[in-house]
Amino acid sequence: MKYDFTTRVNRKGQGSFKWEDMYAKKPNVADGIVPLSVADMEFKNAPEIIEGLKNYLDQVVLGYTMANKEYKKAVCNWMKKRHNFEIQEDWIINTAGVVPAFFSAIQEFTKEGDGVIIMTPVYYPFFNAINLQGRKLIDCPLIEKDGMYYIDYDLFDKLSQVSENKVLLFCSPHNPVGRV
C-alpha cells in the first residue's frame, strides 16, 4: 500500500476535540502546528479503509449491536496468541470506550477518599477519572533519563504499601511516552 504521510489535514471546524480545544486555548496558533494531545488521525483515511467500509456498509444495516460469543472468543484467542495470556469469556466486560472503562473501574474498586496511583506524565483523562469521583490522586512520576522514561519501582513499592492506596491505574503502552 502506497500512502501519502506528508500532507497535513487541518481538522478545524470538523468537531475534532483536540483541534477545537487547541484553537479555543490558542486562537491565533500558527499554521502548521498539529495538536498531539490524543491518539487521533492527522492524515486522510487510506483508500483501502474507505473501500472496506463502503463494502461493509453495502452488506449491513446500522444499529445497536452487542458482543456475541464469536466476539468474546476472538478476544480470548487474541490475548492468547499475542500475549500468551489466557482469559475467560466471562471476564470480558464491554464498555462505551476506554475512558468510561477506567471511570467504572475506579468506581468499582475504590471508594471516595481512596488513593489511586498513576505514573505521570500520563493520558490526561486519568486525572479527571480520579478527581471527579472524589478519589485521591497519588503520583508516582516516571523517571526520565536520556530521553527514555522508566518506572520508579522504589517509589511505587513505597506508595503501594499505603493501605489507603487501592488501585494502580496503569497505561500500557504508556501514553504519552510510548513504553510498553
Segment roles from a protein language model:
Residues 142-180:
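Active-site phosphate-binding strand-loop segment of PLP-dependent enzymes
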Residues 2-97:
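N-terminal small-domain helix-loop-helix segment of the aminotransferase-like
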Residues 84-85, 106-110:
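Glycine-rich helix-loop-beta junction characteristic of Rossmann-like nucleotide cofactor-binding loops
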Residues 36, 53, 75, 92, ...:
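Generic structural signal for small/hydrophobic residues in well-ordered secondary structure
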Residues 108-130:
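Conserved PLP-anchoring active-site segment centered on the Schiff-base-forming lysine
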Residues 132-137:
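A short helix-loop-beta submotif of the ANL/AMP-binding
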Residues 120, 139-144:
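Short beta->alpha connector loops at strand-helix junctions that form conserved
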